[in-house]
Amino acid sequence: KTIWVKFPLISNEFNNCAIVIWTTTPWTIPSNKAVAFNKDVSYGVYEVIDTESECWLSKGELLILANKLASECFKQARVLNAKKIKNIHFKDFNTFKTKHPFSNLAGSNEFWNYEVPIIESSIVTEETGTGFVHMAPSHGAEDYEEFLKRGWLEKLTHNVNEDSSFVKMMPIFGGLEIFNKKGKEGKANEEVIQKLIEVNCLMARGRLNHSYPHSWRSKAPLIFRNTKQWFVSIDKEISNIDNSDQKLSYGNTIRERALKSIDELVSWFPKSGRNRLFSMIETRPDWVLSRQRVWGVPLAC
């Protein structure tokens, strides 16, 4: 399922105006925390002039889209005629504010009543979509990296359980599954789409055949969740090192010690094994100790 979603602006010179995003994962919309644009993409404000009878947009609505992608977006939304009324410079986004599509959803208990920041990011392209990317840092690595470098990790949500169901505390969607126990699509995606229609924030919907990650063990589809883990920082300097002690002279970090030990403390048979292990440790990120596995959680003691 693919959807085009309106994020209403709450502070700009136009009334009834929204930024439009496109996503293939409707279930991530409840966890949205930002909208991203690219300063190298040209944008415009478009007014809907005429539509087909079955269309979720209304005449007179204003939408901000990438100029290169606007025509295809309106085609998907069954808009017969739209005109560009203004170009948007990327610096203009610094003055814009938007809100979550579910901010006024009945029964939401103000769960989504927060300002959604508009941020600049190079992950946004003009290849497909709208020229904007909806950011759910709890469910996407690139989204997470954008929040990490801004020091925004406190904004992360944990709305999805290990079994792919929304947490019970979430209004409206609590308990709904993204995928069921048989690996088939659950009710979450469709319910999110229906609520977007209810709050008049769905521009269009469609279907797209694309690759999707699956478990190599069970062959079931996967979802991405940001969860708390224990890590070993392999590049952090180890304290209280007595450099006079020969046993502690292999380096000041775990990585340095491991690499030096490979060459000075280990005899290799065959020697090709040394290169494989050395290159792996030389480039590996911090070591996650608590990585969940099907058969258990190994922890170093």
Annotate each PLM feature.
Residues F37-K39:
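Electropositive, beta-rich accessory/interaction domains or terminal extensions
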Residues A34, Y43-F132, A141-E145:
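Protease-associated
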Residues V41-G44, H210:
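Intrinsically disordered, low-complexity segments enriched in small/polar residues
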Residues K1-S31, I49-T51, T95-K97, G107-S108, ...:
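Residue patterns forming the tRNA-binding/recognition surfaces of aminoacyl-tRNA synthetases
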